[in-house]
């Protein structure tokens, strides 16, 4: 196991900056998830740590050693890819032992590591099969097994579940989290799927445009997004972002420079509320039933701003209904559009 430090890490492709001065410390045994939209730099950053991309500037330290210019094979890191990267002509056992044989690990040690990995991942019955004889989930477990047998200082996961169907992704998320906790190996995991990120991470690193927008536990990032981007990216349905002048009056003042308000769909309550609440009237345009909740698409009166409210299905609404809504002031997220940041920084 090892701590990983990224110090002002940058990556340029010619004149184009892709990763813009990343500073991050991953504690020994921690699971960090890098999450963000396509093109935000998260996979490039992971490949820089792995040594598959040359670092333009900055420092990368693993266990206190600067490894920015060390060959990938000598960084003691194991990577799990989206496409499994298994040799199709080899059996599962041969795939697991291939890297160890190249490193001249003794045969008895190879056998021990394969047996341990097969036991942890429950792939013992597949050892003599070839990848084409396995399901997608089984192939991904073999790919993780190949990483485990290396006994690395850290795991790097590059969107490993993207090729799996929704049901299998849920199961594999649980397996990866269980495995990481069991092995206590420092891990960095890249995904664009926020649900995957929220369920796996000890801490989230939300990226956008090659920069870090926010670092925090999943609960911290969800409850208190620090930027407009994070507010709109984390959460499903996403947070409603509304210009302050599009909302009705309230007897409570917002922090200075607030001109944009974020409201989680679940924070919108039906009914008039009290004078202390933020209140507005709206028309129901569309109702989506999602399990025990309805995502109700609303158009705020006068402003014509469209928002989403999540309400229980036992609240009987019809499209074209006109309803009153209220939000507790404590549930509002105040932002400034120019800076893109919260205005209640001291709270």
Swiss-Prot record:
<dbReference type="GO" id="GO:0001407">
    <property type="term" value="P:glycerophosphodiester transmembrane transport"/>
</dbReference>
<comment type="similarity">
    <text>Belongs to the ABC transporter superfamily. sn-glycerol-3-phosphate importer (TC 3.A.1.1.3) family.</text>
</comment>
<dbReference type="InterPro" id="IPR003593">
    <property type="entry name" value="AAA+_ATPase"/>
</dbReference>
<keyword id="KW-0813">Transport</keyword>
<comment type="function">
    <text>Part of the ABC transporter complex UgpBAEC involved in sn-glycerol-3-phosphate (G3P) import. Responsible for energy coupling to the transport system.</text>
</comment>
<dbReference type="GO" id="GO:0016887">
    <property type="term" value="F:ATP hydrolysis activity"/>
</dbReference>
<keyword id="KW-0997">Cell inner membrane</keyword>
<dbReference type="GO" id="GO:0055052">
    <property type="term" value="C:ATP-binding cassette (ABC) transporter complex, substrate-binding subunit-containing"/>
</dbReference>
<keyword id="KW-0547">Nucleotide-binding</keyword>
<dbReference type="InterPro" id="IPR013611">
    <property type="entry name" value="Transp-assoc_OB_typ2"/>
</dbReference>
<dbReference type="InterPro" id="IPR015855">
    <property type="entry name" value="ABC_transpr_MalK-like"/>
</dbReference>
<keyword id="KW-0067">ATP-binding</keyword>
<dbReference type="InterPro" id="IPR027417">
    <property type="entry name" value="P-loop_NTPase"/>
</dbReference>
<dbReference type="Pfam" id="PF00005">
    <property type="entry name" value="ABC_tran"/>
</dbReference>
<dbReference type="InterPro" id="IPR017871">
    <property type="entry name" value="ABC_transporter-like_CS"/>
</dbReference>
<dbReference type="InterPro" id="IPR003439">
    <property type="entry name" value="ABC_transporter-like_ATP-bd"/>
</dbReference>
<dbReference type="InterPro" id="IPR008995">
    <property type="entry name" value="Mo/tungstate-bd_C_term_dom"/>
</dbReference>
<dbReference type="Pfam" id="PF08402">
    <property type="entry name" value="TOBE_2"/>
</dbReference>
<keyword id="KW-1278">Translocase</keyword>
<dbReference type="GO" id="GO:0015430">
    <property type="term" value="F:ABC-type glycerol-3-phosphate transporter activity"/>
</dbReference>
<feature type="domain" description="ABC transporter">
    <location>
        <begin position="4"/>
        <end position="234"/>
    </location>
</feature>
<keyword id="KW-0472">Membrane</keyword>
<protein>
    <recommendedName>
        <fullName>sn-glycerol-3-phosphate import ATP-binding protein UgpC 1</fullName>
        <ecNumber>7.6.2.10</ecNumber>
    </recommendedName>
</protein>
<feature type="binding site">
    <location>
        <begin position="36"/>
        <end position="43"/>
    </location>
    <ligand>
        <name>ATP</name>
    </ligand>
</feature>
<keyword id="KW-0762">Sugar transport</keyword>
<comment type="subunit">
    <text>The complex is composed of two ATP-binding proteins (UgpC), two transmembrane proteins (UgpA and UgpE) and a solute-binding protein (UgpB).</text>
</comment>
<dbReference type="InterPro" id="IPR012340">
    <property type="entry name" value="NA-bd_OB-fold"/>
</dbReference>
<dbReference type="GO" id="GO:0008643">
    <property type="term" value="P:carbohydrate transport"/>
</dbReference>
<dbReference type="GO" id="GO:0005524">
    <property type="term" value="F:ATP binding"/>
</dbReference>
<keyword id="KW-1003">Cell membrane</keyword>
<dbReference type="InterPro" id="IPR047641">
    <property type="entry name" value="ABC_transpr_MalK/UgpC-like"/>
</dbReference>
